[in-house]
């Protein structure tokens, strides 16, 4: 991992066409501007993780529902 120190207004170039600019630095918050081509996804990592976790929870809920229906069928037959 490359670690850089940047001041407000400084920019970083990634590849030939992605620019990261330090917009402002406040107490515990750094605001970044990202200029990238439209075909490049730019996502906040924590939001991506949250969506993944919600998808896992939804899948587990569906699996539980299927097991409950299977159990219900066992009692119905017996």
From Swiss-Prot:
Key words, A-Z: Bacterial flagellum biogenesis, Cytoplasm, Repressor, RNA-binding, Translation regulation
BP terms from Gene Ontology: bacterial-type flagellum organization; mRNA catabolic process; negative regulation of translational initiation; regulation of bacterial-type flagellum assembly; regulation of carbohydrate metabolic process
Location in the cell: Cytoplasm
Gene Ontology molecular function, alphabetical: mRNA 5'-UTR binding
Coiled coil: none
Superkingdom of this protein's organism: Bacteria
GO cellular component, one term: cytosol
Main location: cytoplasm
Record-stated family: Belongs to the CsrA/RsmA family.
Subunit record text: Homodimer; the beta-strands of each monomer intercalate to form a hydrophobic core, while the alpha-helices form wings that extend away from the core.
Function: A translational regulator that binds mRNA to regulate translation initiation and/or mRNA stability. Usually binds in the 5'-UTR at or near the Shine-Dalgarno sequence preventing ribosome-binding, thus repressing translation. Its main target seems to be the major flagellin gene, while its function is anatagonized by FliW.
Name of protein: Translational regulator CsrA
Organism, as annotated: Caldicellulosiruptor bescii (strain ATCC BAA-1888 / DSM 6725 / KCTC 15123 / Z-1320) (Anaerocellum thermophilum)
Gene: csrA
